[in-house]
Amino acid sequence: MNSKEPLVSVIVAAYNQEKFIGRCLRSLLYQTLPQDSYEIIVVNDGSTDRTPYALELFHDAIHTITNDQNRGLPASINKGIMTAKAQYIVRVDADDYVNTNFLNFLHYFLDQNPDIDAVACDYWLFNETEEWLERIDSSLRPIGCGILFRKQQLLDIGMYDETFHYHEDQELRIRFEKKYS
């Protein structure tokens, strides 16, 4: 793990993601942003498959928090946010993988634009067989993953609403935009 305070904290919540978590973490570990500039916090949300074993393979490179039972995505993300040391927070879902410049570009943009509250990246959709379907413009169809926030602003709006089981990202964005737009 890092010896200095990280610039970015990446939060990954994982519930029964043994099939995808390794690829996700490998993509996060091979970033152009130096590894001592970010931390990866994985919240294992009470997985009953081999997700804990997969996470153990990365134990030297990630910080793992384990929920003793499934608490849900919003609660797990919030737990990661509360643990995060960095001033910038980005959520990446366990079944996602990111470009090698992902953290570098997002961090650089937000760091160079103090008047901007958050920054999102476009994303690509693939089907179950890894066939590329389309590139999505995040300004038209934003999702919860891939948005770099300032940690203090997430804390100020109360983070994710843990009563939401679906669309927690949309609800968070609505509250965020009301306060910061």
Spell out what each predicted region is.
Residues 101-133:
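Conserved donor NDP-sugar-binding/catalytic core segment of glycosyltransferases
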Residues 166-172:
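Acidic donor-binding loop at a coil-to-helix junction in glycosyltransferase catalytic cores
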Residues 67-84:
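Glycine-rich, basic loop-to-helix element that forms the pyrophosphate-binding segment
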Residues 1-27:
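N-proximal low-complexity "stem/linker" segments adjacent to membrane-targeting elements
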Residues 44-53, 69, 93:
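A conserved acidic beta->alpha catalytic loop
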Residues 26-37:
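Short, acidic, metal-binding catalytic loop of nucleotide-sugar glycosyltransferases
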